[in-house]
Design a protein with these regions (language model features):
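Amphipathic, heptad-repeat alpha-helices with coiled-coil/zipper character that mediate oligomerization
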Residues: 102-110, 152-162
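Outer-pore/vestibule module of multi-pass helical membrane proteins
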Residues: 106-125
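Generic structural signal for bulky hydrophobic/aromatic residues embedded
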Residues: 103-107, 146, 206
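Residue-level signal for the membrane-embedded core of alpha-helical transmembrane segments
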Residues: 108, 147, 151-154, 194, ...
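Loop-to-transmembrane boundary segments
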Residues: 134-152
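Juxtamembrane interface at the cytosolic side of transmembrane helices
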Residues: 89-103, 107-108
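Gly/Ser-rich, low-complexity
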Residues: 1-92, 121-138, 157-219
């Protein structure tokens, strides 16, 4: 399986977990409001709370942990959304930017072509000598850049498969070593997920930046 798909799947699972946690939190808040009302369910809840005080205890706990729950759910949505939606679009975003850059180069070539042709003129038919060489390099850039962009794209995909496979295999080992006998719990999961997300972003951008790097370095 392509490592990029594995990264996206982890983002999907994270977003589903965040949505489930948000749903549970909203349900708990709704039940708390029902208890405060005078509906049939609210009256029964008031009677049960008067006998056991469980309702007041749960309301106090929910009120105390609400900021932490909201923060954790928000972090999970951001990290999960980054892995699930943004990361798979990075190759297209970079490719689109490179294509627009090539169109700009074509526009520059259209403007510069008459000037380049003018440099070939001379009273003795020899033109302006070595000053015309820049035009040939520019023409080569216009013609060859799309092919080199495709080469860079495939090189980036191959590099991502190698680097992503290595990351997915080694990250779990590094995590197990770092968390040996640790009991930090849910907050550590969020921080490690943030570390993994940042490493994935760096990897994918570094690999598919070859779409831009290969033409610039070759031409």
């Amino acid at each position: 399986l392509n490592p990029l798909i594995k990264m996206k799947n982890l983002g999907d699972y994270t977003m589903v977990a965040a949505e489930t946690a948000m749903g549970a939190y909203v349900t708990a808040k709704a039940i708390e409001k029902v208890k405060d009302g005078w509906s049939v369910a609210g009256v029964f809840a008031k009677v049960a709370n008067a006998v056991t005080s469980v309702g007041d205890a749960l309301s106090g706990v929910l009120e105390g942990v609400s900021p932490f729950i909201i923060g954790l759910v928000l972090a999970m949505f951001i990290l999960g959304g980054t892995l699930s939606t943004y990361l798979p679009m990075v190759p297209f975003i970079i490719w689109f930017g490179a294509a627009v850059n090539w169109l700009v180069v074509v526009g520059e070539a259209i403007i510069a072509a008459p000037l380049w042709a003018f440099t070939h003129l001379g009273s003795e038919g020899e033109g302006m000598g070595h000053k015309t060489s820049h035009g040939y390099i520019f023409l080569l850039n216009v013609m060859i850049r799309p092919a080199l962009m495709v080469v860079g794209f495939f090189l980036g995909g191959a590099a991502l498969i190698a680097g992503g496979t290595l990351l997915n295999q080694c990250f779990g080992i590094a995590l197990a070593n770092a968390q040996f006998d640790s009991v930090t719990g849910l907050f550590s999961i969020i921080f490690y997920l943030a570390i993994y997300c940042s490493m994935c972003l760096t990897l994918v951008h570094s690999c598919f930046n070859l779409i831009l790097i290969v033409p610039d370095q070759v031409i």
